[in-house]
Each structure stands twice: as C-alpha cells, then as structure tokens.
C-alpha cells in the first residue's frame, strides 16, 4: 500500500534577532512562506520570525 502524501508541512520559524530561538508550526504545502512577529525570550522583545529549513 502506498504512503499517503501529507498536505501540511512542519516548518521552523527562526528569530531574525540571531539568538537561535525558534518556534515550530505547520502550514499547507501550497501556502507561501510564513513570517510572524512573536516574542523572543532570550532578548525579551518581539521580533520577526521567518521560515527556515528543519534539519
């Protein structure tokens, strides 16, 4: 039996402040790349988090 193709991806949202802090979210495969302004606890500020590759 063939494996079912997943419609959603797990993506890593990495802080643009360079602290290395990240969130993991899921998004549809057809959607554009994610970017959020969220809280970075290492610098105690809200910063932009952009999608990067998961290892």
UniProtKB/Swiss-Prot annotation:
Pfam families: Ribosomal_L33. GO terms for biological process: mitochondrial translation. Coiled coil: none annotated. GO terms for cellular component: large ribosomal subunit; mitochondrial large ribosomal subunit; mitochondrion. Keywords: Mitochondrion, Ribonucleoprotein, Ribosomal protein. The keyword Ribosomal protein applies. InterPro entries: Ribosomal_bL33 (IPR001705), Ribosomal_bL33_sf (IPR038584), Ribosomal_zn-bd (IPR011332). It is found in: Mitochondrion. Transmembrane segments: none annotated. GO terms for molecular function: structural constituent of ribosome. Component of the mitochondrial large ribosomal subunit (mt-LSU). Mature yeast 74S mitochondrial ribosomes consist of a small (37S) and a large (54S) subunit. The 37S small subunit contains a 15S ribosomal RNA (15S mt-rRNA) and at least 32 different proteins. The 54S large subunit contains a 21S rRNA (21S mt-rRNA) and at least 45 different proteins. bL33m stabilizes the tRNA acceptor stem in the E-site. Belongs to the bacterial ribosomal protein bL33 family. This is Large ribosomal subunit protein bL33m. It comes from Schizosaccharomyces pombe (strain 972 / ATCC 24843) (Fission yeast). The gene is mrpl39.
């Amino acid at each position: 039996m063939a494996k079912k193709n997943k419609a959603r991806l797990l993506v890593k949202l990495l802080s643009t402040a360079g602290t290395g802090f990240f969130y993991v979210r899921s998004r549809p495969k057809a959607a554009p790349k994610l970017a959020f302004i969220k809280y970075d606890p290492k610098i105690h500020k809200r910063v932009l988090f952009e999608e990067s590759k998961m290892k």
